[in-house]
Amino acid sequence: MGRLLLLAGLVLLMKHSDGTAYKLVCYFTNWAHSRPGPASIMPHDLDPFLCTHLIFAFASMSNNQIVAKNLQDENVLYPEFNKLKERNRELKTLLSIGGWNFGTSRFTAMLSTLANREKFIDSVISFLRIHGFDGLDLFFLYPGLRGSPPHDRWNFLFLIEELQFAFEREALLTQHPRLLLSAAVSGIPSIIHTSYDALLLGRRLDFINVLSYDLHGSWEKFTGHNSPLFSLPEDSKSSAYAMNYWRKLGTPADKLIMGFPTYGRNFYLLKESKNGLQTASMGPASPGKYTKQAGFLAYYEVCSFVQRAKKHWIDYQYVPYAFKGKEWLGYDDTISFSYKAMYVKREHFGGAMVWTLDMDDVRGTFCGNGPFPLVHILNELLVQTESNSTPLPQFWFTSSVNASGPGSENTALTEVLTTDTIKILPPGGEAMTTEVHRRYENMTTVPSDGSVTPGGTASPRKHAVTPENNTMAAEAKTMSTLDFFSKTTTGVSKTTTGISKTTTGVSKTTTGVSKATAGISKTIPEISKATAGVSKTTTGVSKTTTGISKTITGVSKTTTGISKTTTGISKTTTGVSKITTGVSKTTTGISKTTTGISQTTTGISKTTTDISKTTTGISKTTPGISKTTPGMTVIVQTQANEAETTATMDHQSVTPTEMDTTLFYLKTMTPSEKETSRKKTMVLEKATVSPREMSATPNGQSKTLKWASLITEVETYSQDG
């Protein structure tokens, strides 16, 4: 009762907004009419005033052209769907192409060449105008996954850029409003980094529908909610985490539309007495009477289930669940939708996306709360608000994390949160005509150090989005080594004093060191093979490095007449730094100490001028030292060859032959640049040339592409990281 009173107060406060125009984007599926009895929904059953944008799912593709899935869609559903705009002139309708069952092969074929994309774009403009749609929604699940090659990530971006250009040109020529362009994208971090360039998508698309649901389901071994608003730290499976992740990658917040599911997912419990959150399950529970899909209930089926079940609230996730016997259900209701809508407004996101409008209680016959109870609350909070300076309520976002909410089982919590396997499945129970609906691929999870807590905050995190890195595995390692730097710095300074006492002994053994140079170079292959082992002892090595640089000054005072050997020593230093570069592939911490060693070389060369006057008497040792010079020369030559090879490989990895090079970003970093902690970035910026004005060769490459400028930027990083 207390929660209901609190919610009532919050809703009254939310009636006053900051004047921002929020989108309420609602999907309608072309199979909704095929459900039995009162669950059968046609377009004329929809309320045209509830949503700001209606999206018809789904169209298909044939011979690289957009087509209707069947004649009924084209002749009956399309006209009836767009006729809703006669009742609401402000309503926008879009046609979505793709979906889970559509797969990826037809997308890949269409994206592969400029000619295929142009054919698709021409068909899209004609098809949308003929049937009265206001835009296109791309529902490609997912570029670079499920059989889609990695370069589809970039070809997908090229298609979006070319669609936007064509839509603008068509609007200019016909004086019609420009067609809208949106896309449905994943809310799972590892899929995001594999499939999308978040920054560029945010610039090209009118809005982005984030699939912030299907985060838990009966494919897992433990119960979990389908779409929690928040999650525990180190857990990326929540709507807030997904939205903030896209925003951190550079997507404008006002273009991000958060997903709201009008369905729940159920589990069959292992033990009836263990019925809380994160308890063991044996798979999906019984299918719904109308949707007929195991592990899945539409909201109108949820209402029937909870009327005879025990209901609970997950405090830190702001969502409900219910259980009856061995059946456990995580779902959304009007209260959880209200909290999520308030979160959207508080974070200034673009609005809410509903999957789907036809799974709400359309006629109000199942739940007893009137037609469209879920979507109606979103309409009240996001659309029917008036401008006012009243601030949004803050207190509910600052509650502490309660890991032991009603019925939770903490014993199972750790195992679930530490899993590194993500199941990819159809969003929102899309597949309605087949018995097998779940598909999955194993993905490596991203470290969730930026997880969103009920406080609505996120810990700082940096992201490096480059064309070369399509997976998050490398980035995860880079983040770990950054932490490693800061931990070893203090230890280095503590050992300096002890090493300075051995200066005199070091100066007497200089000749012996030069003779052993050849032996050191011979052991380089062995060192590189043992890299994994070396990384475990790196902490000890890094602590002595700074001390060595400080003892050089003492050596210069006692080393009379060693000017002839100085050159030989400087050559061996280059060889050592090369060894370090190999090791830095496994432990970046070692590469940081290399800078300290290279600085000692400069110090020695500076003392050479002063000592050259006392060369007499040391010349007897010169022949022995000169014998090592050829070996040093070989090392220097090898380094130069490797640097050239690395640069060549970097260039090749950026632009695979299958990619259309309408635009790309090129980054290179040679070993010598790594030694000086410098990174060179070259950005090729495209001139404003229409894709239609580019003549394409058979492999899809444009040969009339012009570039406005070649910009070279050099960033210098301090040696302390």
Curated annotation (Swiss-Prot):
GO terms for molecular function: chitin binding. Residues 1-21 form the signal peptide. GO terms for biological process: carbohydrate metabolic process; negative regulation of binding of sperm to zona pellucida; single fertilization. Sequence repeats lie at residues 486-492, 493-499, 500-506, 507-513, 514-520, 521-527, 528-534, 535-541, 542-548, 549-555, 556-562, 563-569, 570-576, 577-583, 584-590, 591-597, 598-604, 605-611, 612-618, 619-625, 626-632. Residues 444-456 have a biased composition (Polar residues). Glycans are attached at N402, N442, N469. Residues 444-465 are annotated as: Disordered. Residues 22-385 form the GH18 domain. It is found in: Cytoplasmic vesicle, Secretory vesicle. The keyword ATP-binding does not apply. It holds the Pfam family Glyco_hydro_18. SMART domains: Glyco_18 (SM00636). Residues 486-632 are annotated as: 21 X 7 AA tandem repeats of S-K-[TAI]-[TI]-[TAP]-[GED]-[IVM]. It comes from the Eukaryota. Chitin binds at L71, Q72, G98, G99, W100, N101, Y142, L211, S212, Y213, D214, W355. Belongs to the glycosyl hydrolase 18 family. This is Oviduct-specific glycoprotein. It comes from Mus musculus (Mouse). The lineage of its organism: Eukaryota, Metazoa, Chordata, Craniata, Vertebrata.
